Amino acid sequence: MLSVASRSGPFAPVLSATSRGVAGALRPLVQATVPATPEQPVLDLKRPFLSRESLSGQAVRRPLVASVGLNVPASVCYSHTDIKVPDFSEYRRLEVLDSTKSSRESSEARKGFSYLVTGVTTVGVAYAAKNAVTQFVSSMSASADVLALAKIEIKLSDIPEGKNMAFKWRGKPLFVRHRTQKEIEQEAAVELSQLRDPQHDLDRVKKPEWVILIGVCTHLGCVPIANAGDFGGYYCPCHGSHYDASGRIRLGPAPLNLEVPTYEFTSDDMVIVG
């Protein structure tokens, strides 16, 4: 009779490695084996064995307690020996270096120093901001040569009565007319209802004998001709606009009177325009 282990096939590893002898003439196919006793592993006791149980045994079992009190120096708990505690003594003032002394005695002096530094810093920042704003505004203002052309002085004695003289002012022609008494009376007698741009003669002059105008036609910007036209004042040859001796539009396509600039008589013989 064959052994059960010899007929088990693939299940032989999971079956017990034993055989049972049966009386007969045949020899058993599988010899009986005796299981060997396993050797016990030997631990290296020189090296510590780290596990959850061994580490938990080294942990502190008592609760952590922190004590706080007056005039008690602070204590540092070192988790690692390579950590350095920062020292800010170089940034502290001499009055507060000693932790055992009260800082209330030196508080007034420290506050005064802080206020002084803050005040000086504020004044410096305000002064710098003022200079920056001044330079920025001055950079946008007109240059010296432009300001020189902003005003012009005219000597009135050089202009004879009944004549008109042209000057260049701010890139534009400037007309200064010395009117006769007849022209003054003639322009003062004009009714406002006859004018396209109603304006009295006395409203356009500061002295009746002097008329100061910008010589640019209000139609398309041409330069009129003095002492010409149907009204004895100014005539624009571009499109036929007629102005009187006061610079008021009387005939033609121009919609407005000639512009009167800002001027001031500094004396009887001098006028400043601008």
Swiss-Prot record:
Localization terms from the record: Mitochondrion inner membrane
One annotated GO molecular function: metal ion binding
GO cellular component, one term: mitochondrion
Post-translational modification: Proteolytic processing is necessary for the correct insertion of UQCRFS1 in the complex III dimer. Several fragments are generated during UQCRFS1 insertion, most probably due to the endogenous matrix-processing peptidase (MPP) activity of the 2 core protein subunits UQCRC1/QCR1 and UQCRC2/QCR2, which are homologous to the 2 mitochondrial-processing peptidase (MPP) subunits beta-MPP and alpha-MPP respectively. The action of the protease is also necessary for the clearance of the UQCRFS1 fragments.
Cofactor descriptive note: Binds 1 [2Fe-2S] cluster per subunit. Fe-S cluster delivery to the Rieske protein is mediated by components of the iron sulfur (Fe-S) cluster assembly machinery that reside in the mitochondrial matrix (including HSC20 and LYRM7).
Main location: mitochondrion
UniProt xrefs under Pfam families: Rieske (PF00355), Ubiq-Cytc-red_N (PF09165), UCR_TM (PF02921)
All ranges on the Mitochondrial intermembrane side of the membrane: 141-274
Disulphide linkage map: 222-238
Mitochondrial matrix side of membrane: 79-103
PROSITE patterns: RIESKE
Topology within the bilayer: Single-pass membrane protein
EC nos: 7.1.1.8
Residue span, Rieske domain: 187-272
Membrane-crossing residue ranges in chain numbering: 104-140
Noted disease: Mitochondrial complex III deficiency, nuclear type 10: A form of mitochondrial complex III deficiency, a disorder of the mitochondrial respiratory chain resulting in a highly variable phenotype depending on which tissues are affected. MC3DN10 is an autosomal recessive form characterized by fetal bradycardia, poor feeding, hypotonia, hypertrophic cardiomyopathy, alopecia totalis, low mitochondrial complex III activity and lactic acidosis.
Matches recorded under NCBIfam families: Rieske_proteo
Stated name of the protein: Cytochrome b-c1 complex subunit Rieske, mitochondrial
Organism annotation: Homo sapiens (Human)
